[in-house]
Amino acid sequence: MTPAHPSAPAPSPNLALNQLVDRRRARGESLVHLAFGEARLPVLPQLAATLAAGASRAAYGPVAGAEDVRTEVAGYFTRRRQPTTADQVVVAPGSKPLLMALQLTVPGDVLLPSPAWNTYAPQARYAGKRVYGVPVPAECGGVPAPDALRTVLREARAAGGDPRLLILTLPDNPTGTLAPPALVRELGALAREEDLVVVADEIYRDIVHDPDRTPFLSPAEVAPERTVVTSGLSKTLGLGGWRIGVARFPAGDTGERLRDGVIAVASELWSTLAGPMQHVAAYAYAEPPEITDRVRAAARLHGAVARAVHRIAVDAGAACRPPTAGFYVYPDFEPLRARLAARGITDSASLAGALLDGSGLVVLGGHLLGDDPKALRFKAATSLLYGDEEQQAAALAADDPTRLPHIAGELDRIAKGFARLLD
């Protein structure tokens, strides 16, 4: 596979599309926004009160985060079968800067599942790394197919590359699926065999739709000595604008070296997470009942709406993995290629353009996610279909949120937009 080389900075495509939607809506256009993975939910009153109570935390604190905060985060990971001490934790203004700091800290090139979240590859390039995309298996996204990973490693090294960092997303953005435990075990063994550092982005972990039927195994349980886990509160609690991220580093020398490297980068970039946000983090990661109740309700809502969009895509003739976590679906319109080609739709860019121009549906084309640009795939984020704050609250409480008029109306527009592709 030909690696991608460093290039000039460009705006993040999902953020650029989000701003495009704002501009066009300001001009009076009616758009269905499926291109931005924001968990649009009302802020819990207890979170707002905690933020206000933390206003007096105005001084600079430790770069890694205050000890009380890191202790609560350590407890969160320990409750998820990842025994953790406060010294293994770093908190930051979102998980995105932590991922960038890891790219700057871990030597060598980067291996990514293809497709993948659109931020990993640009960060790697800014860090001067080559990026090697590896196809995902048929059953899920977020992880590379093991045989394909072995092939890419062999070919990259033969060509002079030095892949040492493997980034996984569990559950996955963009496919809304979760790698099964057997596959995670195989990849953990492969990472150990090939001496790869693993970064497991687990920011969607707590919004698996049905955790009793969808078991979660972290790479940190399989290869604990080489796995860094990142997470945050943006997806589970709808706090994207508050920018609270965390990282858990392995115990032992490797983990200490990686943690110290990230802290060094942090000291030059963000200094410390804002004090009031640390106050929020300590409260949220302690997981009092009101937090866990909200997360469960959010997972039910995300699951119901994502499954509805999945059904619409399949009914339209697309192939699509059933979503099991988060709020994404990743339809593949390859079965309709001949009919779409007759309308000038031959790749993901023209497919996304046709949906926008013909139906006001804003999606993120697969070519922006490291996927084959000739494929007819795109990501649809379903979490902005919940309406205004009052409607969001109603959706969280509803037995079937897809029957609420404001959500049903958006789903109907999506179905008509997909059908219009073939008119």
Which sequence ranges carry the predicted segments?
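Hydrophobic residues in well-ordered beta-strands that form the structural core
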Residues: L112, G133, V198-A200, V363-G365
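Conserved glycine-rich beta-strand-loop-beta hairpin in the small C-terminal domain of fold type I
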Residues: A299-R307, V314, C320-R339
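Helix C-cap/helix->beta junction micro-motif
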Residues: R24-R27, A127, E193-E194, A316
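Conserved core segment of the aminotransferase class I/II
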Residues: R226-R300, D412
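Active-site phosphate-binding strand-loop segment of PLP-dependent enzymes
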Residues: G141-T214
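N-terminal small-domain helix-loop-helix segment of the aminotransferase-like
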Residues: T2-P93, P137, E287, Y386-E389, ...
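PLP-dependent aminotransferase-like
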Residues: L104-L168
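PLP-dependent enzyme catalytic core of the Aspartate aminotransferase-like
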Residues: P83, A341, A354-V363, L369-D423
